Amino acid sequence: MNGEHSMATPGESCAGLRVWNQTEQEPVAYHLLNLCFLRAAGSWVPPMYLWVLGPIYLLYIHRHGCCYLRMSRLFKIKMVLGFALILLYTFNAAVPLWRIHRGMPQAPELLIHPTVWLTTMSFATFLIHMERKKGVRASGLLFGYWLLCCLVPAIDTVQQASAGSFRQEPLHHLATYLCLSLVVAELVLSCLVDQPPFFSEDSKPLNPCPEAEASFPSKAMFWWASGLLWKGYRKLLGPKDLWSLERENSSEELVSQLEREWRRNFSELPGHKGHSGMGTPETEAFLQPERSQRGPLLRAIWRVFRSTFLLGTLSLVISDAFRFAVPKLLSLFLEFMGDLESSAWTGWLLAVLMFLSACLQTLFEQQYMYRVKVLQMRLRTAITGLVYRKVLVLSSGSRKSSAAGDVVNLVSVDVQRLVESILHLNGLWLLFLWIIVCFVYLWQLLGPSALTAVAVFLSLLPLNFFITKKRSFHQEEQMRQKASRARLTSSMLRTVRTIKSHGWECAFLERLLHIRGQELGALKTSAFLFSVSLVSFQVSTFLVALVVFAVHTLVAEDNAMDAEKAFVTLTVLSILNKAQAFLPFSVHCLVQARVSFDRLAAFLCLEEVDPNGMVLSPSRCSSKDRISIHNGTFAWSQESPPCLHGINLTVPQGCLLAVVGPVGAGKSSLLSALLGELLKVEGSVSIEGSVAYVPQEAWVQNTSVVENVCFRQELDLPWLQEVLEACALGSDVASFPAGVHTPVGEQGMNLSGGQKQRLSLARAVYRRAAVYLMDDPLAALDAHVSQEVFKQVIGPSGLLQGTTRILVTHTLHVLPQADQILVLANGTIAEMGSYQDLLHRNGALVGLLDGARQPAGEGEGEAHAAATSDDLGGFSGGGTPTRRPERPRPSDAAPVKGSTSEAQMEPSLDDVEVTGLTAGEDSVQYGRVKSATYLSYLRAVGTPLCTYTLFLFLCQQVASFCQGYWLSLWADDPVVDGKQMHSALRGSIFGLLGCLQAIGLFASMAAVFLGGARASCLLFRSLLWDVARSPIGFFERTPVGNLLNRFSKETDIVDVDIPDKMRTLLTYAFGLLEVGLAVSMATPLAIVAILPLMLLYAGFQSLYVATCCQLRRLESASYSSVCSHLAETFQGSQVVRAFQAQGPFTAQHDALMDENQRISFPRLVADRWLAANLELLGNGLVFVAATCAVLSKAHLSAGLAGFSVSAALQVTQTLQWVVRSWTDLENSMVAVERVQDYVHTPKEAPWRLPSSAAQPLWPCGGQIEFRDFGLRHRPELPMAVQGVSLKIHAGEKVGIVGRTGAGKSSLTWGLLRLQEATEGGIWIDGVPITDMGLHTLRSRITIIPQDPVLFPGSLRMNLDLLQENTDEGIWAALETVQLKAFVTSLPGQLQYECSGQGDDLSVGQKQLLCLARALLRKTQILILDEATASVDPGTEIQMQAALERWFAQCTVLLIAHRLRSVMNCARVLVMDEGQVAESGSPAQLLAQKGLFYRLAQESGLA
């Protein structure tokens, strides 16, 4: 045929736009498409693209553009080419005009098209210019435009060249070829990147992100990240290998934007009080707010991040448009395969279109995912920063309602859950759109039979929602049990010394395993429901297809089930199934996110510190006054009653004011009121000048000594040295391995209690403040150290002389040195004046002193006189004492966040020398997970269950393959009179295979989850047992945070993540085998292409897994630092505010978050790199399957072709998820490595021994004998105690004293076998303690430590952990310690729930409760290890009186700093350098005038 039948001549218009050129059966190259259609598409599509998107793009770069670019060579070439194109199209427009002028008739389009292109090219050239001015270095818009300009016109040009029309219109064709060449050149240039901006706003980072230097194709496919992935494959990645963070991703930028919007929205709330949020005083209100405060936060998030979210949503919508183009193209392709007379080029074209549609879907979907993941990263940073800034302004009442662990949980769980929900926001509306489009497709394919799909779908939807709701209930129950387990575990680890000292491990393990059992029960139920849900999702495609096919076969007139109807229906139903699956899941995730969002909003609305609570202004004070309180009434929160009433106080410049009073009088509250920490009900507070604060419980940071002291101030070495010497830290620091640069560990793990307190004091002194507020800083110090510190720092001649000082103290002998004394009682000022004035008044102060003078029992006269002298005599007895350096704790590693109280992680290792101190760091695994880890997990699952699971997966996948193959046979059945003969049989077998697949799928899913629960149970028990059986030295060396990670985060991964990743991997791996088998069986030729594709997949997988595993581990470690810093700041927020250090602390938090983002960003880019490239290769497999089907059309049925191509369409996601699942599983398997870290650590001696059971009443008398006893705390350290040989008689009361580092506490550790003897031994009632199990030994000895310890739970549980006493006995013990009235006043009385570790009680009250607990144990041996050091003299007298009555017949070992405490002991042991230097009664030792006498002199007792 002639070409004129298919081509329009240049002068004629196109009458129709039929796509297919049907004039010839086998057309030549230039007959492929109708020329008129190509002309219309080529003429209008590129201009429409640019004119629609161009103005929007101009507006965007106008708002978001940066500095202009240099006029580079690349820009000049682009502009020259642009002007050349303008000239050519001007010429093309001028030619028709010239011809019209000459009278030649011309078609309208010959003038319209060049004119449109002329204006469009002018606009494109203008965009090139504007991009340079706005700093755009690689344009995606123009890349797409030049690409469109090349594709369709190129086909048109090829057709014209093939038609041989060059000779007819040579000039026109030359212009066309030249234009095409210039457009191709522009396309090539648009793939290049221009030079950086001429003037950059920021200095160039050391390792900039290569995205800025990437071309548009590289950005689209994330090839710019390949360098980092290749580097991670070749070596271990370090911080220097990661890209620098862009400013738009920095914490400072993100948090400031969100905080500004949030505060603006919050201020618009009705009832807003200005400085403070809505009060939520109870922890329950924090966890489950009664009324939502989400509005301001939600609006703030939307205003800050809406542009990123909306751009991502646009990409998703475009991606879904191409998603739904694939079924239509598949329908056309199967129609082509079923028509034996159709032309081959139709199949080729459809294969190319399916490939392009799939590629465009991949491109836009990955761009959506990239934008959403970046949005998630930014939102996590912004909200975490907002929470951190809120922590810095929380009021004291708000802090009491939440613990550090709650805040960390808020950031690590709730924030994460919130940001993950962003991915599901579009699911609320877009999935419904999917469903509508799917039903439209089904109606077109099957007609009214598609209505049955609607019915089945609607019947399954409530089932899925019901399952999701039930599963959500059990998940919430699991979360509650997990939270309970986490709190109990945290308490156990932070109080492990107390637990081990009392032999309570079994009780706590039993309690913990009970909670764990309930948690696993909820987990199993949730997993069972999840299995049902997964099966319903997977089988819903089959159910809908079965019903639709059955109805269509029975009802429809044209009821033949051909390949197009069968496999296009299945393809559409697979999309519908995704919608059905993700819709309930999206709703569930959003519901969970709403709960988390409410918690976050409630926390952000908690009451803040009143900025007007304390005025730093001299206007309210006279010129000589520094502090003034006028008619002050203060409360801890809006709901609590006032704790201070009618306070009127004026403190002049340079005054030392001592504040005293009984326990609970309000002494610490007064300091908090001065700091503005309490809610000011009425009155005014004014302070002139800067303030420094020393808390009662020392708070130190996990940094070096010098950084703790300087506390974000400039280093002044002479002043630093002077401060350290005055605070009695000079000799200590000199003994440290790195001097002032020695890390102190988290919460000062590497320091003794006294060192931490003096470090806290040094921090305040270094400040050079005008006003000093000190909350009993001398309580934790030895007598001689206390004297030295008071004289050199606080006293009249100390470093702080001339400053205004308020000293809360229980050390009454310093009162004569104070300028003024304030006595508080019941929250009011009882009296105030000088020491002599108050003595003459004979008022409240005299009552306190008289109480301190009262002896606890009958003692020696000299001891009583000495006690009186100690209380009232001041420092009359001695000059400046000679001090030895107090030796730090023996830990090699620092722990992480924890309470500063608790002897637990703080052995008073006053006797241990430290050879090296380093901050503890958690172990980080490198490289691939070892096969032994997988084997250990599989052994925990069980070999039979593993084998059974694989068999079930194989069976259900075989059923799935047979189901698809059987459908292809059904589709190929011959049609006779519009009907197929065996439809009933085909349908029945199809349904049977589907049922078998459903059963196998449910069984396999359930087997995976049950196996995971079994493995999790065994691994947790193993971890718990390994940790509980570890000696105390293990806890001193291992940070608490590391252990908590094992019991919380790592255990959660083993519980949930590993079974889920294992299920996903097995599902997709077996599905991949099915796809490969289907494609290979239908078109064996495809194997030739599949093998290279699989090699490329393996290469991508290797690069990704090697890098991603490292990035995830680094990210986890960096995020732990963020959480640790957050917890540390929460615990010390009062100090931070007092020192006005919020700015530096915020900057440190931002730096830690930025470092975390430097790792998070490459990881999310690596995920997109993998997905984009694997989907691109998967799309190639679709193309291979389609082209092979076209090549094999002569002998390939339409049914098999549909089976092959429809399976190949699923392989894109399948192959990606195989790699992703394997990577996720390997990352999750790191948790198994970590929970097994402590399997091979040394363990304690057995808790129970058979020999112990034979002596149930041991010990009867309580005689203790040391025989040449010695111990060291670690093999590399010197002996802490050596050569101790002595006998303590039954019922004897022995005091143990000595300087710091003398070995006092080490004796008690040896007695309790917290440290095993290195030499010699200890006998109790003639029985070696090594013959007794540890629990038998420790349960027969009672110890009251210096720092009182309470546990989460009821007051009764704390008093009687083993439930061995009646309520009457407990009340009797409480009455003995004079706490019965206090406990009676509590809500619930004995069932009163203690907050945290008794944070809602004073130190004195907690110590008395610990004493009551000791009374209830009824043991023959009692150890008091500095038990009265932190309490006031009145409380100490109460304790001594109770001990005298209850333990009169028991052997008592009393370790004391205050020599007054041991003056009425029958015998005193004086320890020195690990040996017993002196032994005898107090009177005898004083008469000897030896070491005890010198200690008494330093304490003012001699």
From Swiss-Prot:
Residues 5-37, 100-104, 156-173, 322-347, 446-448, 553-574, 960-996, 1082, 1196-1197 are extracellular. Disruption phenotype: Deficient rats develop ectopic mineralization in the skin, eyes, and the arterial blood vessels. Plasma inorganic pyrophosphate (PPi) level is reduced by 70 % in deficient rats leading to a lowered PPi/Pi ratio. Its main location: membrane. Glycosylated. GO terms for biological process: ATP metabolic process; ATP transport; calcium ion homeostasis; gene expression; inhibition of non-skeletal tissue mineralization; inorganic diphosphate transport; intracellular phosphate ion homeostasis; leukotriene transport. ATP-dependent transporter of the ATP-binding cassette (ABC) family that actively extrudes physiological compounds, and xenobiotics from cells. Mediates ATP-dependent transport of glutathione conjugates such as leukotriene-c4 (LTC4) and N-ethylmaleimide S-glutathione (NEM-GS) (in vitro). Also transports an anionic cyclopentapeptide endothelin antagonist, BQ-123. May contribute to regulate the transport of organic compounds in testes across the blood-testis-barrier. Mediates the release of nucleoside triphosphates, predominantly ATP, into the circulation, where it is rapidly converted into AMP and the mineralization inhibitor inorganic pyrophosphate (PPi) by the ecto-enzyme ectonucleotide pyrophosphatase phosphodiesterase 1 (ENPP1), therefore playing a role in PPi homeostasis. This is ATP-binding cassette sub-family C member 6. It comes from Rattus norvegicus (Rat).
